[in-house]
Amino acid sequence: MANSASICRPERHTTSEGNTLTSLTKRALTGLALAGAASLVLAGCAAAPDASDSAVPEIDYLACAVSDEGSWNDKSFNQSVYEGLTKAQDELGVQINDAESASPDDFGPNLQAMIDASCDITIAVGFNLVDAVNAAAEANPDVNFVTVDGWSNGATNLKPIGYSMNQSSYLAGYLAAAQSSTKVVGTYGGMQIPAVTDFMTGYYYGAMAWGADNGETVKVVGWDPATETGDFIGDFVPNSGTSKSIAAAQIQAGADVLFPVGGDQFGAVSEAITEAGIDGRMIGVDKDIAASSPEYAEWILSSAEKRMTNAVYDIIKAIAVDGEAFNGDYYIGTLENGGTALSAITNYSGAQMQSELEAKLEELKAGIISGDINPLG
C-alpha cells in the first residue's frame, strides 16, 4: 500500500515542446528522469487529511494517459478518457498521471514521460498516437499500454480499444432523417481517418434507411461512402472558422440536421444554424452533449456516444483491483455491450410521433445487435 500521507494536487507545467504534464501522485515524482520531456513540480500543498477523511484508500497502482492534440477538457474524445482515469482514482484509489499533447511532436516525449514515471498502464488517446504507442510498446516490452482507436502491430503489451461507431451512428442518421423537414441532412469530419468516417458511414446508411422505410427521398451532404469523398476540417481544433464554414455550406445546401464528427464543433454548428435563421438541429458525438455541454442543449437532437470513460475505468479496475493479468486482446465497444449508444432524444419536432420513432429505433438497435441489419450498408 502506497503511503498517502503527503500526497497533494500539483500545478500543471508546460514543457519546452509545448506539452503539458500533470502528476497527481507522489510515486510519479520518485526517481523521476523525464529527459527533458516534461517537468513536474508540486506546489502549494496543504496538510494531508487524516485517513478517515478519505472514502477510498489509495492503492499502489499508477494509471496514466497521454492525450491526442488538444486539452483534456475538449468536451469530447480526450475528456471522455480522462474522466475514466479520474473515475478510477476517485472510486478505486489508484494514482494517476497524465500528459496533454499540444501537437504530434509531443506524442513520443509524452509517452516517454509516462514510462519514466513508472506507470503501471499508459493509455494513448486517439488514432493519431498509434505509431508512437506501438513504438513505445515494442521498445518497452515490460510496460503496459492501451491505444484508444488504434491497433497493435503485434506487441502483447499493447491493448487496442475500438468502437463500432457505425452502429449508434446508423440510429443517429435514421433519427436525423425523421427530424429533417427538408430531408437533407449533413455530416462532416475532423480528419478523413477510419475512426471518423465510421461515424459518417453509419449515419449515411441510417438516413437512407429512413427514406426507404417511409417512401421519401433523403439526401446526405458531406459524405459519400461509395466514393469515400466528403467534407473534412483537416484537424480537430475546436469550433474553428473552417468548421463553421463547412456547416454553413451544408445548411445552404438544404441540410437542417448536422452531425459534426470532429470533437467539439458544436459552437461552430450552433452559430451557423443561428446565423442562417433555420430551425436546425445537430447530433453530438462521443459524449451525451446535451448533458455534458448544456450551452448547446437547445440545438441537440441526440448524440452517438463512444463510451470511453467506462472502457478505461473497466480496464484499470480489472487489473488494479480484480487482479486480472494484462492482455493485448482487442476490446470493441458495440451497442450490445454498451460501449456505444444513442443518447436520449431531445428537441424533436419531426412529423412522425416520437414514441413511434423511439420504438422503431429500438427495433433497429435489436436488428443491428442480431446481425440482421448491416449499418455499413
Question: What are the roles of these predicted feature ranges?
Answer:
Residues 39-44:
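C-terminal motif of bacterial Sec signal peptides marking the signal peptidase cleavage site
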Residues 6-9, 13, 26, 45-377:
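A residue-level marker of the well-folded mature domains of exported/periplasmic proteins
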Residues 1-21:
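Short, Lys/Arg-enriched N-terminal segments with co-localized hydrophobic residues
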